[in-house]
A protein has these predicted regions:
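Cys/His-clustered metal-coordination modules, chiefly Zn-binding fingers
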Residues: 203-204, 233, 237
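Active-site substrate-recognition segment that forms the wall
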Residues: 240
Length: 271
């Protein structure tokens, strides 16, 4: 009997000793959380998208609590509500959040452009891009394998006819999709913007015509038509200065290849 009881008691004693030791260590080596940081963290949506410029929600909350930044409006997904709650905690005036929405600067669907070869590898834009810059003829095109859609925390992106599309009603402007795109053709703009250029091709017009009938050919009709000088052709591609754009839509109406589109991000109208 003692042969069994002694080992059991020994192990029990070791377990109790370790438990006491861990409890003491937890008390003496505990890292006290900043109550202000905790309160701020609860105001944030928890997307951990990094759109604020910090590592995530915890990083932003800590920076605000430690007063290394006083900008209460950096959380785009949280919007004005989060900014107001943070400002109340810090005892400062709330700043307005510039809400943003993502869009894909490509309309090279399967109907208007071709593929260079049949890609049979892993269905990922990043992987496909490593093979001759992707399987689409246009090297600036959306590859359509959905890395952005997989990464989107709001399920706001879907693939339609070989091109990623953003549902502005779901998009929170976190910017995760922007960082996932290997071709860098997803952009964030203010959700009050009304006109976008759905092309990223910087080739000369003659070459663009051959590979995509929806591609910008740099004809400059939009630039000549814009009453505010908000759109210019830079490196063979129409580019909009949203600080000058009033959303009149004149550029879209004269675009011969229809790569400039009007949309309503606030109401969620799709392009």
């Amino acid at each position: 009997m003692l042969e069994i009881l002694f080992p059991v008691l020994l192990l029990l004693g070791i377990a109790v000793f370790c438990a006491i030791l861990l409890t003491v260590a937890a008390v003496f080596f505990a890292v006290k959380e900043d109550e202000t940081a905790v309160a701020i963290r609860e105001c944030l949506p928890g997307a951990n998208c990094g759109a604020c410029g910090y590592s995530g929600c915890d990083g932003y909350a800590k920076a605000l609590a430690e007063k290394t930044t006083t900008a209460t409006n950096l959380c785009v997904p949280g919007g004005d509500d989060a900014a107001g709650e943070i400002a109340a905690i810090l005892g400062v005036e709330a700043a307005d959040v510039v809400e943003q929405v993502a869009y894909v600067a490509c309309n090279g669907t399967c109907d208007v452009t071709d593929r260079k070869f049949e890609y049979q590898g892993h269905k990922s834009c990043l992987t496909a891009n490593m093979v001759y810059s992707g399987d689409k003829v246009c090297n600036f095109a959306c590859l359509g394998y959905g890395d952005c859609a997989v990464a989107c925390p709001q399920n706001a992106i879907f693939i339609e006819n070989g091109v990623a599309k953003v549902d502005p009603r779901k998009c929170i402007g976190c910017g995760i999709c922007v960082r996932q795109c290997p071709n860098g053709i997803i952009h964030l703009i203010k959700d009050t913007s009304r006109v976008i250029v759905e092309c990223s091709n910087h080739d000369k017009g003659a070459l663009t015509r051959k590979i995509c009938s929806n591609g910008c050919i740099g004809c400059m009709k939009c630039q000549k038509t814009c009453p505010n000088g908000a759109i210019k052709v830079i490196d063979n591609l129409a580019t909009i200065d949203y600080n000058l754009c009033t959303g009149c839509g004149e550029c879209a109406s004269v675009c011969p290849v229809h790569c400039i589109h009007e949309g309503n991000f606030v109401c969620g109208a799709h392009f």
